[in-house]
């Protein structure tokens, strides 16, 4: 089985567009469809025909180009069953634990409510790829628009059990701000300090910070580390639940 090919590019202001191409079948999936023109440019540049859109959630900056791409390519749009009514052009719904084949590549659906009520992530199991959209960012997580903090914490735990070497592709280039915030709640984390310096250098050169790995996030992302004693001490929350610590970190990030 030939490895998947990926193309990552910017859409809108800070959205990542991602095309996933299976060279054996010619299938190409857009992970969300934030903006038509950059997606078409990437597909044309690579000589790929878009056959699928894998929608993660209903926000406009993730579905804006669904109908235009469907009209041009006749692509199949897959998305979360719990947001079906809000996703333009949806053909097939997916629930937590569902799986399907993209060529010979198994894709498992993980429902991660928090940012929205029905947000899903796509895990390419054998390829060790996770498309986490607005649930898990590099050094961050999505804002909580439709579900409470406890729900997002439990959603993140569903992702945290995946293999450490899993490559994580996320929805926005927010990493520099996330790194600066992370240092305010986990200031003694040496791995975080070195990573923040790396991110400052990458962004100064205009380079993307995607992908990250799940193992790196577990070492440095405060939103996955609410149980960490050092963070709890810094926040003076030693006796609180993981959900309460996570909620405090999220509140601080909202006001950062």
Curated annotation (Swiss-Prot):
Its cofactor is Zn(2+). Coiled coil: none annotated. Pathway: Secondary metabolite metabolism; methylglyoxal degradation; (R)-lactate from methylglyoxal: step 2/2. Zn(2+) 1 binds at residues 57, 59, 115, 134. InterPro entries: Clx_II_MBL, Glyoxalase_II_hydrolase, HAGH_C, Hydroxyacylglutathione_Hdrlase, Metallo-B-lactamas, RibonucZ/Hydroxyglut_hydro. The keyword Hydrolase applies. GO terms for molecular function: hydroxyacylglutathione hydrolase activity; metal ion binding. Its EC number is 3.1.2.6. Signal peptide: none annotated. It comes from the Bacteria. Zn(2+) 2 binds at residues 61-62, 134, 172. It catalyses: an S-(2-hydroxyacyl)glutathione + H2O = a 2-hydroxy carboxylate + glutathione + H(+). Binds 2 Zn(2+) ions per subunit. One of its GO terms (biological process) is methylglyoxal catabolic process to D-lactate via S-lactoyl-glutathione. Keywords: Hydrolase, Metal-binding, Zinc. Monomer. Thiolesterase that catalyzes the hydrolysis of S-D-lactoyl-glutathione to form glutathione and D-lactic acid. Belongs to the metallo-beta-lactamase superfamily. Glyoxalase II family. This is Hydroxyacylglutathione hydrolase. It comes from Rhizobium etli (strain ATCC 51251 / DSM 11541 / JCM 21823 / NBRC 15573 / CFN 42). The lineage of its organism: Bacteria, Pseudomonadati, Pseudomonadota, Alphaproteobacteria, Hyphomicrobiales. The gene is gloB.
């Amino acid at each position: 089985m030939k490895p998947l090919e990926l193309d990552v590019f910017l859409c809108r202001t800070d959205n990542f567009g991602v095309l996933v191409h299976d060279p054996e079948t010619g299938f190409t999936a857009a992970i969300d469809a934030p903006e038509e023109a950059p997606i078409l440019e990437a597909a044309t540049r690579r000589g790929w025909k878009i056959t699928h859109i894998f929608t993660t959630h209903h926000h406009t900056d993730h579905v804006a180009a669904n109908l235009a791409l469907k009209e041009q390519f006749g692509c199949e749009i897959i998305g979360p069953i719990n947001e079906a009514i809000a996703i333009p052009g949806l053909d097939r719904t997916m629930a937590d634990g569902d799986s399907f084949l993209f060529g010979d590549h198994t894709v498992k659906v993980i429902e991660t409510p928090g940012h929205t009520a029905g947000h899903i992530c796509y895990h390419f199991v054998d390829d060790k790829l996770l498309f986490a959209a607005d649930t898990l960012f590099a050094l961050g997580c999505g804002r909580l628009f439709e579900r409470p903090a406890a729900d997002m914490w439990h959603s993140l735990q569903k992702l945290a059990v995946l293999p450490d070497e899993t490559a994580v592709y996320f929805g926005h280039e927010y990493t520099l701000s996330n790194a600066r915030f992370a240092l305010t709640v986990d200031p003694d984390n040496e791995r975080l300090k070195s990573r923040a310096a790396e991110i400052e250098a990458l962004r100064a050169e205009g380079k993307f910070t995607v992908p990250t790995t799940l193992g790196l996030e577990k070492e440095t992302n405060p939103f996955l580390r609410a149980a960490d004693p050092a963070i709890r001490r810094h926040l003076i929350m030693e006796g609180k639940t993981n959900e309460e610590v996570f909620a405090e970190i999220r509140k601080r990030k909202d006001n950062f």
